[in-house]
Every structure is written in C-alpha cells, then in structure tokens.
C-alpha cells in the first residue's frame, strides 16, 4: 500500500514558512489511518511495529533525487517488538541501525561516512569481513554508536516518536524538491 503526498502539499509547506499546514497534517493522519486499517497494523505500535518507507518521487527520473528512508517507525522500544515478532534479534537491530543511518543522512544531513567509519571500525575489531558477520550484540553496539553520532551532530537524542520521524522525513522530501542540482 502506498500513500502519496502531492506537490501541492510542498507548495503549501513553503507558503507556510516551511511548516506543514494543519490541513495537510490532517490528510496525512487520515491516509495513515486508512493504511493501518488495510494492513491491520498501527503506526507507532511498539509490539507489532508498522514500519514505512519514505521516498521522493517524480513523474520522470531526476538526478540528485533523495535516497529512500526505510524502516521508519523503529525506535528503542519498537526494535524489541520487531525482534520478538520475527524471532530474530540480529535482523531487528540491523534494521534499526540502517534506519538511523538513512534518517541521519537523508533527513538530518549528517555525513553518512561518519556512520560507515563506525561500522568499519567495529567490523575490524571483531575480525568481520562483512556486515552479516556481526551478531545481534554487535548490531546493538552499532545502534548505540550511531545514536551517539546523531547526538553529537544534532545536539539532541535520536527521535523516538514515529510521527516525529515521519514529519521530519516528509519535510526532507519537500526540501529535496526545492534543491537545484
């Protein structure tokens, strides 16, 4: 299921001093509720996480278009729910670390190399050749370190509220539409 936010919403965002107008927020909430009903999940549910991806789209391919953000909705509690739901703690924490990295890079404009360096350092310390050679505890450590990078660069903790994450990602899409390549 997909939910589309049209270019008119972007125009409204810029006409409202780079704030998403209440009317658009209500439309987002309504579309989320409809998607929740279809999927049988609730956005922000910590035990049965409903994760979304956010990407910019255009009718034609555009160079420099922002990267997709996957696993939006994960946080320190939802990751535990995902681990329990999938019976795979490593998968859950790997998904969370990927989300933190994508969100930090694409939405918050923190240099992705900072995250890659941390992952490479941990792999080297563990004698791991590939990310897949790291276990669940290693992924938890990567998440901890990634959140520290976020804190050091943004002066605040990584956002734990899925709705806050979603709105920030939507604003990043709007910013990407206003970027000259």
Locate predicted features.
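N-terminal beta-alpha lobe that positions the nucleotide/phosphoryl donor
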Residues: 2, 6-181
């Amino acid at each position: 299921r997909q939910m589309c936010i049209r270019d008119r919403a972007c125009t409204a965002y810029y006409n409202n001093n780079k704030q998403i107008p209440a009317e658009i927020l209500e439309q987002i909430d309504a579309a989320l509720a409809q998607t929740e009903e279809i999927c049988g999940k609730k956005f922000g549910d910590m035990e049965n996480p409903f994760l979304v991806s956010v990407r910019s789209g255009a009718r034609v391919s555009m160079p420099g278009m922002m990267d997709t953000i996957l696993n939006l909705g994960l946080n320190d509690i939802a990751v535990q729910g995902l681990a329990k739901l999938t019976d795979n703690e490593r998968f859950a924490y790997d998904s969370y670390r990927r989300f933190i990295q994508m969100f930090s890079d694409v939405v918050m404009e923190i240099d992705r190399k900072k995250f890659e360096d941390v992952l490479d350092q941990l792999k080297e310390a563990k004698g791991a050749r590939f990310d897949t050679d790291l276990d669940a505890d290693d992924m938890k450590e990567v998440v901890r370190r990634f959140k520290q990078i976020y804190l050091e660069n943004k002066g605040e903790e990584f956002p734990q509220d899925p709705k806050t994450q979603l709105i920030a990602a939507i604003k990043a899409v709007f910013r990407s539409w206003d970027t000259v390549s």
